[in-house]
Amino acid sequence: MGNRKLSKRQKERIQSIQERRRERANLKNSIGDKALEDLADLGSETTGTVVTNYGAQVDIEGDREPFVGTIVRCFKRANIDSLITGDRVVWRPAEPQGVVVAREPRQTELIRPDNYGKLRPVAANIDRIAIVFAAQPSPQSNLLDRYLVAAEAQGIEPFLILNKTDLLDHQSYPQVDKLLQNYQFIGYKIIRVSVKSSEGIDQLQTYLSQNNSIFVGQSGVGKSSLINQLQPENNSPVGPLSAATNEGTHTTTASKLIHLNGGGVLIDSPGIREFALTHLSQESIINGFKDFRPYLGNCKFRDCQHDREMGCALLDAVAENKVLADRLKNYRQIIQSQSHK
């Protein structure tokens, strides 16, 4: 039988059924109050951090003796909302597995869509978002701006890592160098690194040493190789670029929290090809372009769309080289893509 095109209502019904199935599967693997009685040697409450999330179960790293630095696989109680890497939790040790009994409020969270388009948090309590890009695959300012807007909207400090600087040649260098100059003009921190030559690795280690950070970026930009250079014992699998698409193959399947030897915490996240902003309002998106902020509210018309209107403060700023034309173009593209969601 040939493939049949599904209507929007049919797709929504299928998605709803699949969502309920996933929820039932998670519920079967969570643990209720009665089941707690079946666990032997149920210990006192202690605190820890979610290192990796496997859905119904999580790995917790204890931060109190005798569990400091120890990774314990835990169920979660049925009344606890979803847990994600970086969550601070209260848990109780038990045999054969521990039990998470509470989750502390999140200071920040990073959100991305799942395979069904539903927004899911993927990491919690992070201070900085490291947006990794490279000469291959070719960096796109529109994608970088999506990451930056998402970070700004969450109140998380973003910075840029140009990886694989050893791959820059006379053809790719001008484009990438221009991109770097643009973001430096805006005021973003940029660190240039190469795993092959070790360029910038010490600078990056120092910058990461005092914070909880997360690496995000397209597949194939070298996040896993870079993490292995920062933390050799981590041994994240490395995927090559696909010859057919010149894009990377996905190698990381679940977000993982790593303690860096030089200090600081790093979360290694799955490759994100496009960063969803569907949960953000138009006001949040435009405020996510921090170089626009001095001009917002100064347009002649209150409903200015910053397109062709007379008296648009942003258009005037572009004409005066105070705002980059590419940034305004990317903003318009993001808003246009939002209208089609």
Regions found by a protein language model. Name each.
Residues 167-221:
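Canonical P-loop GTPase G-domain recognition
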Residues 1-152:
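C-terminal effector/interaction modules appended to NTPase cores
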Residues 2-14, 44, 72, 81-87, ...:
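Helix-rich effector regions associated with P-loop NTPase G domains
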Residues 219, 224, 229:
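Walker A/P-loop
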Residues 126-133, 154-166, 186-193:
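Conserved beta-strand/loop subsegment of P-loop NTPase cores
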Residues 150-157, 181-185, 294, 340:
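Arginine/glycine-rich "motif VI" loop of SF2 helicases in the C-terminal RecA-like domain
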Residues 139, 168, 199, 273-276:
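Catalytic P-loop NTPase motifs of RecA-like helicase/translocase cores
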